[in-house]
Amino acid sequence: MKKLILIGCLMAGMNINVAWANASQNLQERLGKVNSFHASFTQTVTSDDGATIQEGEGQLWVKRPNLFNWHMTSPDESVLVSDGKTLWFYNPFVEQVTANWLKDATGNTPFMLITRNDAKEWSQYKISQQGNDFELTPNNVTGNLKRFSITVTTDGTIQKFSAIEQDGQKSAYQLKGQQNTHVDAAKFSFTLPKGVTLDDQRQ
């Protein structure tokens, strides 16, 4: 009897692992159907008790695997651009630009995961699927990310994604009007504006 129970437990574990593997493969395949796109987005940040901390909106351009332009237009403007090698963050309010090597950028943020769609990075998460909804839990619980969810249709259209941090703060993004089309290369180049300070972390 004990042997049967043990076998049953092992089989259940195998089924869970297969489900995680299938969900991960499905998510990667869906995201892989779209190489480049443009969309507008809204952002809502809430505390662990559900209180709204910040609301914002902006525009997003992506060309996988390493090119993107994330332009937050409100409540405060900020620009995050990857040209494939350097990650540029521009804050017009403080007139400062920070430059980092893209290869050094963390892969455990939802946006970087979506943009890169790298199998090695996805393997660091347990992934479950319900229809178009995917939920990801990091294998490494020591990080700041507690849970990440994304809704992506079978044709690769991202409808929304959100991240919950260990302290319960949630950042939710709703994408609207995604256009799966060619994006001009100029969107992924960054020219240092006159009069701003450059904090170059690539040294």
Curated annotation (Swiss-Prot):
Main location: periplasm
UniProt-listed SUPFAM superfamilies: Prokaryotic lipoproteins and lipoprotein localization factors
The keyword Nucleotidyltransferase is assigned to this record: no
The entry's keywords: Chaperone, Periplasm, Protein transport, Signal, Transport
UniProt family annotation: Belongs to the LolA family.
Subunit structure: Monomer.
Protein's gene: lolA
Listed InterPro entries: LolA/LolB/LppX (IPR029046), OM_lipoprot_carrier_LolA-like (IPR004564), OM_lipoprot_carrier_LolA_Pbac (IPR018323)
Any GO BP annotation: lipoprotein localization to outer membrane
Organism encoding this protein: Photorhabdus laumondii subsp. laumondii (strain DSM 15139 / CIP 105565 / TT01)
Name this protein carries in UniProt: Outer-membrane lipoprotein carrier protein
Purpose of the protein: Participates in the translocation of lipoproteins from the inner membrane to the outer membrane. Only forms a complex with a lipoprotein if the residue after the N-terminal Cys is not an aspartate (The Asp acts as a targeting signal to indicate that the lipoprotein should stay in the inner membrane).
CDD domains in UniProt: LolA
Transmembrane segments annotated in the record for this chain: none
Pfam families: LolA
Gene Ontology CC entries for this record: outer membrane-bounded periplasmic space
Gene3D superfamilies with a match to the protein in the record: Lipoprotein localisation LolA/LolB/LppX
Protein localization: Periplasm
Domain of life, source organism: Bacteria
Signal peptide region: 1-21
